[in-house]
Amino acid sequence: MLLKKPSYPINNSLLDYLERFDRISKVPIFYDDLLRFSGSINVYDKHDQDTLWVRVYYTEFERSEIDLTLMKIYSLLHSDGNLGIIKFLNVDSIDYCTFGNSKPFRIKVRNILNDNYTHFYIKRADASRVYGLELEHILSPDKINFLVYKDTLIEEHIMGIAGDVFIKTLLADCTETEKSQIAKEFVKFNERCMIRLLGDMRSYNYVIIPIHDFDQVVYRIRAIDFDQQCFEGNFKVYRPQFFKENYPMVKLVKDKLQHSSIEQYKDEVRAVLAKRIHSAENRIKRLLQIMGSDVISTDEHLNQLKLELYSYTNDLNFKKAKSMGNVMSAAFEFITRNFKNTNLFNTGF
């Protein structure tokens, strides 16, 4: 069982980095302000199951002020701060999550002209999560939008079907071809998480995204929680295949894919990551330098992880690492140096 991760503050070097890449909110917003709600009711899904979210309410004066701030935040996320769109927006709901580490607020903003709506989240800013978000933006197939204001983090909503919901309600109805494609995507997702040391990817921490092509439906798997970036010491935590919640996906891989295909898909991930690391070399170097001098885990976790990685790779750079940022640098150096070798990490599939 994973221990609750503490929240690590964002240091000045990381703030300077975020400023350089337009990640600082121009609109003041504080997570603690949203905690001053005067009441709440439980939110249930369409099957009348408790979602562990509550819908919160504020006094009339506070609500009008909060709504205006949230609409300005929306304009920053989606239209580069164009305040002209605010007159077409309405904050339909503010929900608070009672489950998990970050206890986020989920904001629903609706366009009153056509009833289209979108969500974003307000959380306490945490250095681990910010590093995870930034690495996701640079290295993953999908870009991600987020902003920071002092000790508050604003994250866009990542659309998709929660992995646990998909596994429970939709996986069995997929065609055999679709199951093979999902197995392939899980292998790739597993490899990406392992290489970039994104931990705790249980089925409820990622989404599955169906994409309708002209003659088929294909599926993508995307992380939605970046709290466990480079924190845990156990290397298995960074490999989704070892969580019991993901067993149906692991079984799918074993049932549908041959070993040679698994190795091929893992190699494809390494090749793509190596190219992305090279193409964003300056930005990644700058981020990893800051990460290398930051504290985002415990000494116990650091020592455990670097020795486990050394035993897997025989790369002395892991053993010499003085911080989790150094471990991340060693991992990226290792992958760019050796990505053509199909036996880099033995993931156990």
Residue map of PLM features:
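Short C-terminal domain-edge/linker segments immediately following a structured domain
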Residues: 137-140, 151-156, 185-188, 239, ...
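Conserved kinase catalytic-core segment
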Residues: 173-235
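C-terminal catalytic region of ATP-dependent kinase domains
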Residues: 215-349
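AlphaC helix of the protein kinase catalytic domain
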Residues: 166-172
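Conserved ATP-binding subdomain of kinase catalytic cores across diverse folds
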Residues: 32-37, 49-165
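Regulatory N- and C-terminal appendages and interdomain linkers associated
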Residues: 1-80, 299-349
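A general structural signal for short secondary-structure junctions and capping/turn motifs
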Residues: 4-9, 97, 112-113, 144-146, ...
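Short charge-dense sequence patches
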Residues: 12-27, 54, 75-89, 135-141, ...
